[in-house]
Regions:
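A ligand-binding cleft/hinge motif common to bilobed small-molecule-binding domains
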Residues: 141-149, 195-198, 222-252
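N-terminal secretory signal peptides
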Residues: 1-26, 30-46
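Periplasmic-binding protein-like
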Residues: 159-166, 232-273, 295-301
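Extended ligand-binding regions for polar small-molecule ligands
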Residues: 50-52, 56, 101-110, 170, ...
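Extracytoplasmic small-molecule ligand-binding "clamshell" domains
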Residues: 59-140
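Ligand-binding cleft/hinge of the Venus flytrap
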Residues: 88-93, 104-113, 189-208, 235-239
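Short helix-initiation/N-cap motifs at beta->coil->alpha
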Residues: 117-127, 171, 189-190, 204-218, ...
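Flexible hinge/capping segments at coil-to-helix
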Residues: 167-183
Length: 301
């Protein structure tokens, strides 16, 4: 005896009155056919939904796993200025070198990929990362409350102080408070610009430390702010430079790597934090610090 389908069983369970007593057999067959079509359509619809859900889930996973995407591509796209010695700059052979270059290369190696460097002006670095053109910015970026609202920061990989520089014959500016009503030059949107403005200075936008020192020497600006270690490095290369350091911030700034905020960067953030911890533990960060700054800035003093 043939096994009844669910539709056939349903038709048998319905009373004859349901079919109005006319041509019951024919109407039962019509009912069975109609129900069969509806059932098949339902199965197909559910299958389609399932396929779409699976595809959406797969796409979502890919989007949410930035680290996986980077490792599949085999490259980590790093944005930096390339004109801020000793963080990132071009040596005599025009090779891109510097502390941030080597730190990011060591991190990329820990992730199992190759670094790809993209050079840009300071105020374009974050816009490029926001647009998805870069995976991260490694450019001596100081962690601030304002930046932390927009970006997720890694563990700090070095610590610096902001120093105030003036011409050697300037005895008027001795503290940050003396900047009120004065003119400084700094990269636009940098923490140095923000600090100078907070003390009442007018800031002229400039791209490189070299240009800033030239403006200072020419008397076109009254002072400038930058990382203490950047000034020390400049004086090592240019011992006769016409400027002196008169003040520096008491608390050290934390320098870290910003990533686009959100779940998409979570695995990448964890992986970079692990890499930084390992590079600090095995002495790599200390070695690179001493190579480029003449001192260890990888630990907070």
């Amino acid at each position: 005896m043939a096994r009844l389908t669910c539709v056939e069983k349903l038709s048998d369970d319905l009373p004859d009155q349901y079919f109005n007593g006319k041509d019951i057999t024919m109407k039962r067959r019509t009912f069975i056919s109609l129900m069969g079509v509806m059932a098949a359509a339902g199965v197909l619809s559910m299958t389609g939904c399932s396929s779409k859900d699976t595809a959406a889930s797969t796409a979502s996973s890919a989007t949410l796993n930035k680290l996986d995407s980077i490792q599949k591509s085999g490259k980590l796209v790093v944005a930096l200025e390339g004109a801020w010695q000793p963080w990132s700059y071009h040596d005599a052979s025009d090779t891109l070198v510097g502390y941030d270059v080597e730190v990011s290369r060591a991190i990329a190696e820990k992730l199992g990929v190759e670094p790809e460097y993209v050079e840009s002006d300071w105020d374009s670095l974050f816009a490029g990362m926001d647009a998805g053109r870069y995976d991260l910015v490694c450019n001596g970026v100081e962690v601030t409350d304002e930046r932390s609202k927009t970006y997720d920061f890694t563990t700090p990989y070095c610590y610096i102080h902001t120093a105030l520089a003036v011409k050697k014959d300037n005895d008027e500016i001795k503290t940050f408070e003396d900047l009120k009503g004065k003119t400084t030059a700094n990269s636009l949107a940098s923490t140095y610009m923000e600090l100078a403005e907070s003390y009442g200075a007018t800031v002229q936008g400039i791209d490189t430390l070299e240009e800033t020192i030239q403006l200072l020497a020419a008397g076109r600006i009254d002072a400038t702010l930058n990382a203490d270690v950047s000034f020390y490095d400049y004086l090592n290369v240019h011992p006769d430079a016409d400027f002196k350091l008169v003040a520096q911030t008491e608390d050290a700034s934390h320098v870290a790597i910003p990533l686009r905020k959100g779940e998409a960067s979570a695995t990448l953030l964890d992986a970079i934090n692990t890499a930084i911890d390992e590079l600090r533990a095995d002495g790599t960060l200390k070695e690179l610090s001493e190579k480029y700054f003449g001192q260890d800035i990888s630990a907070e003093n």
